[in-house]
Amino acid sequence: SLIELGKMIFQETGKNPVKNYGLYLCNCGVGNRGKPVDATDRCCFVHKCCYKKVTGCDPKKDRYSYSWENKAIVCGEKNPPCLKQVCECDKAVAICLRENLQTYDKKHRVTVKFLCKAPESC
């Protein structure tokens, strides 16, 4: 769910997920997808594509288990297949955001989404 996603983002980046990524550029948080503008935005684009492949559960609402072990996200073994997939999507975006912190630009924290160019396909 968005709760676990937010925790993972905070654990990996040290940033408040809602404040820093909730409206970041074209693909992070709410709103329509657009052509990714920077590496951080591309992480979010790939995450939305990952969610599109999930069937059988609601990635934004359904809770799953994971743990934080030795500064690493470990998806719970007892999660059903669908939620295991959601956990892996969320883990991947959290790691991607950490790996691309150097491209994060505070001035893009709030972006008017209609200015985004047409989206790429997944």
From Swiss-Prot:
Sites marked Important residue of the cationic membrane-docking site (MDoS): 106, 109
Site described as Cationic membrane-docking site (MDoS), located at: 112-113
Identify the tissues in which this protein is expressed.
Expressed by the venom gland.
Has keyword Thylakoid? no
Molecular function (Gene Ontology), one example: toxin activity
**What residue spans carry the region label Important for membrane-damaging activities in eukaryotes and bacteria?**
106-117
**What is a single Pfam family found in this protein's UniProt entry?**
Phospholip_A2_1
Q: What does this protein do?
A: Snake venom phospholipase A2 (PLA2) that has almost no phospholipase A2 activity. Is myotoxic. Displays edema-inducing activities. A model of myotoxic mechanism has been proposed: an apo Lys49-PLA2 is activated by the entrance of a hydrophobic molecule (e.g. fatty acid) at the hydrophobic channel of the protein leading to a reorientation of a monomer.
- SUBUNIT field: Homodimer; non-covalently linked.
Similarity comment: Belongs to the phospholipase A2 family. Group II subfamily. K49 sub-subfamily.
Q: What is this protein called?
A: Basic phospholipase A2 homolog
State the organism named in the record. Answer: Protobothrops mucrosquamatus (Taiwan habu)
